Amino acid sequence: MKTVCVGMSGGVDSSVSALLLKEQDYRVVGIYMKNWSRDLPGMKCPWAEDLADAKRVAVKLGIDFEVWDFEEEYRQKVVEYMLAEFKKGNTPNPDVMCNQEIKFKLFYERAMERGADFIATGHYARAVSLARAFATTGANARPLGRELPKANEASPITMGASKEASESDIVLARAKDENKDQTYFSIGFLMKRWRAQFFPLAT
């Protein structure tokens, strides 16, 4: 059985992602990424409540659940970056940096070290195989997005593209729900990681 580590924040999107993957016969492991726990002046960090929500969902779904502490890495890669950009008079985008350095880098690396086959998040985006991206012609031509395959299929890429295919065969594409599309916040990490990434909410 293929194993998927799902980043679970305690919110609806990541919870539904875990449910969809379980329904497709994957061994799902819920992962709460503890990135920040400090209260700021006038602002309480709700990490404990988020963690409790994620745990409750994992229990309800009957899946394993773990907490991975990325606080130090988050401080170095995201917070310090943000403060440095402000000092330069620039407008930083900590969400993009968090995805690039934490959710799609450290999370991916830790999951692979743990022995997972894939990772998944609740982002609204698609990983598209260019090998079959344009399956139709003429007025009906449109890219095909990744769908959730059964757990015994060899690759997470729709229409049979293999893991051994060229990294350039995989590109990031907008989610079908363009009102919720998050591809802008998901840019910036190595294409090879798309091969092990599920976006269950893509469609």
Give the residues covered by each predicted segment.
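Conserved catalytic cysteine-centered active-site region
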Residues: 192
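ATP-dependent adenylation/nucleotidyltransferase module used to activate substrates
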Residues: 1-133, 137, 143, 149-188, ...
